[in-house]
Each structure stands twice: as C-alpha cells, then as structure tokens.
Amino acid sequence: MSYYDIDAILTDAEKIPCTFQIDVPDLGYLDNQPGHTLKSGSRVALPIWLAEMLAIANTGAVDMDDPSQSSKSFITFDLPPALGNDVVQALKADPRSVPLRDQSAHFYALATHMMELSEEPELSAVLRKTFVSRAAEIALHARKVGGGGSSYHGRDGGGAGGKGKGKATKDDNASNLGVGGAGEDFLRGLDEWERKLFRSAHDGTKASKEWMENVKKR
C-alpha cells in the first residue's frame, strides 16, 4: 500500500466510537463543551489514524494507590456502526443482500484495519464468507455485461456502485459497467475493493471476447 494511496487515506479518516480513559484539559469541544475539560468516560468519534495512536499510547503516569491504574491508555474504542451487530447479522443471513457501500465506501479496508487493532474472530469469518459469496455474484454480472461497448459512470466518476445517478455513455476504451434491475442495485452497493474486482473481471471478459472474435476472423 502506497503512502499516497487515496483509498488508504480515506479509510484512515473514517471515524470510530472512542471512550476517553482520563480527563483531558481544554478538549471539551470534542464533546460540545468548549473551554471545558473532556472528562474520563466521555464518548466521542475520532478518525482511525488518531484513535489508533491514542489507544496504543499510554499516560506514563504512576498511581501509587492503585498500580493497576498506572499507565492507562488514553482511550478505548469500539467497532464502528458499519461493522455493528445488525450489519454482521445481515451478512450472515445473505451477504449479497447488503449494500456495503451504504455502510462505508471502503467497507473491507475499514474492516481489515479494525481487525488489525483488535481480535474479532467472528467478524473475520463473516467477512471471508461475505467476500467469497459476493465475488461470485460480481463475476457473474461482469460476464453478463462483458461484451458491450458502453460505460456506466456515476456522478463521482466511479462507475459501478458510484454515488448518485449515472448515465450510459459510449466509450471504446472504458468498461461497460451498466446493468439493469436488481443487478444494478447490487452493483451500486459495491465497496471500493469490489468495484475494482468488477472492473478487472469485466475487462478480462471483454478482452477474451475480442480475442476470440479476432481468432475467428483469421
């Protein structure tokens, strides 16, 4: 992963729920109390890059009355709503029915990062099953539209799964990412990793078809 990887930067900017373990002067504005001390036990949402540093660091203080409280971490954190119990249960029931992009545009990257910070064996198993099930569906849709010459682009220019409405445009050098009905709804729910997978599968199918057509012409 490159230092300048935009997807990685956006993933690190995702906010997760955190609980402060100590009082911090002048940080009350994080809890809508400007000019006040942020009290121990306050819950605030912090970007992953900051939460990770605060969770790993410790205060370095020594409590002579209660040694167990010495050198506490500044914060503890929980899984973000995108990886909450409701989402996990829905993925267990039918991975293909959940629009992952509605949870997070970088769903798998977010989940991977969170699992690096904490042990979540159940979540890991659910995500593996989810990716495999959805990858098969993505490959199926990629084959269905692999022979066309039009390209579907959302307003954000991201293709399948892009936010906002899009339109089909003719582009000999672009992938045909358009598909109708329920299939289009599924593709709009793809996260960034899945969109890249779709493009690769689609372009591979298209290239194979073009190669076969050229062979037949010889």
From Swiss-Prot:
Gene3D superfamilies named in the record: 1.20.58.2050
GO CC terms: GINS complex
Segments of skewed composition (Gly residues): 147-163
Record flagged with keyword Plastid: no
Gene (name only): drc-3
General function of this protein: The GINS complex plays an essential role in the initiation of DNA replication.
Signal peptide residues on this chain, from the entry's feature table: none
One of the GO BP terms on file: mitotic DNA replication initiation
Protein name: DNA replication complex GINS protein psf3
SUPFAM superfamilies on file: GINS helical bundle-like, PriA/YqbF domain
UniProt key word Protein biosynthesis: no
The entry's keywords: DNA replication, Nucleus
UniProt cross-references to PANTHER family, sorted A to Z: DNA REPLICATION COMPLEX GINS PROTEIN PSF3 (PTHR22768:SF0)
Subcellular localization(s) per the UniProt record: Nucleus
Record-linked InterPro entries: GINS_A (IPR021151), GINS_bundle-like_dom_sf (IPR036224), GINS_Psf3 (IPR010492), GINS_Psf3_sf (IPR038437), PSF3_N (IPR055221)
